[in-house]
Amino acid sequence: MTYIENIFLCMVSPLLVAALCMGRRHLRFFLFCIVGMGVCLLSAYINTFLASVCQADALAATAEIAPVVEEMMKLLPLVFYLLVFEPEGDKIKATAITVALAFATFENVCYLIQNGADRFSFIFFRGFGTGAMHVLCGLIVGGGLAYAWQRTWLKIAGTWGLLGAAITLHAVYNLLIAYGGAAQYVAYALPVLLVAAGRLSTFRLSRMK
């Protein structure tokens, strides 16, 4: 049995100390790192509860429950941040990526502790794949919210649309992982390639301007 709340406390403790030492300028980054890990912890409990209530098998829990719960949980702190602080577009995107990155980091650490770290090649691909998938979902939601929340008429519909896109991407990734075999490695490579392609296209557009 993995006591993920103990892992959470161990990982959050140095972040809290660093947040106190770095000052207000970097406080937002550390706070949203802690928030990202916190929503990952809560997502694990909610996933387990819903899978038990719905009597879902492993595939249904992985492909149907987990993507919805996890993407909604990652969205909630962003919506709170938008409603309370009304940040600029760049800060919205950076915050979404920070939450997603912390979420993926905590998830990977829990996976390593539960399943062991003896298979380097598998852990290497999984670390990059899962991290890139969560960051890609963060890019989609964060970049989209930065645009949608500048337009009052688009706030609600845009937020739900972005959430749906992130859930779909997450569900496809989880389905490929659950299928196993070559599809599993396709799933690990796909988000990395999409992030790389997005960065390359952004670089080319900036050079054209």
Model-derived features: positions:
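Hydrophobic alpha-helical segments at protein termini of multi-pass membrane proteins
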Residues: 1-209
